């Protein structure tokens, strides 16, 4: 069984979260936090997170703080996701790059700014499911976790 370690950002932009709205062929639309796989060349999980934010959003984030982790078990893959809260410093979507954008069969990665409130987050399908549960319980607390 393969194990994939991933990092994801709960990226705050004022009182909102920067999320990716994913549209993939043959699948319902869902939302997720930006981030991805920790590569062997990444010096640390935080370095991987900053690389992923640059690739997926052309974004720079301020200080990060780990807030939770979750595991997903598939038939051939065990995925460990570690989530960090951070504030958006800058974002330039024209700088987006990476393999996910090179192949149209990967679907769309639309940026969606969603108020960081349980009411705004409740109606959207957040993946993984533990992300949705965490945000419903802790969305209001996230801004206070950072300097």
Task: Describe every region a protein language model picked out.
Residues 60-68:
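A short coil-to-beta-strand element that immediately follows conserved catalytic motifs
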Residues 72-100, 112-117, 129-138:
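Active-site-adjacent beta-strand/loop module that shapes the phosphate/pyrophosphate-binding cleft
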Residues 16-55, 59:
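Conserved Nudix-box catalytic region and its N-terminal flanking loop in Nudix hydrolases
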Residues 1-18:
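Conserved N-terminal beta-strand and adjoining loop/helix that marks the start
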Residues 123-147:
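Charged phosphate-binding loop/patch that engages nucleotide di/tri-phosphates or the phosphate backbone
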């Amino acid at each position: 069984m393969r194990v994939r370690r991933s990092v994801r950002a709960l990226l705050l932009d004022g009182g909102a979260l920067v999320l990716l709205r994913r549209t993939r062929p043959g699948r319902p639309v869902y939302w997720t936090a930006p981030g991805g796989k920790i590569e062997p060349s990444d010096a640390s999980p935080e370095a991987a997170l900053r690389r992923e934010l640059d690739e997926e959003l052309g974004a720079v984030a301020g200080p990060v703080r780990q807030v939770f982790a979750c595991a997903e078990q598939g038939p051939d893959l065990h995925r460990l996701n570690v989530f960090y809260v951070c504030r958006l410093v800058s974002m330039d979507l024209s700088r987006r790059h990476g393999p996910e954008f090179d192949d149209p069969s990967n679907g769309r990665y639309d940026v969606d700014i969603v108020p960081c409130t349980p009411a705004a987050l409740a109606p959207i399908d957040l993946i993984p499911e533990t992300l949705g549960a965490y945000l419903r319980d802790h969305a209001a607390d996230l801004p206070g976790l950072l300097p």
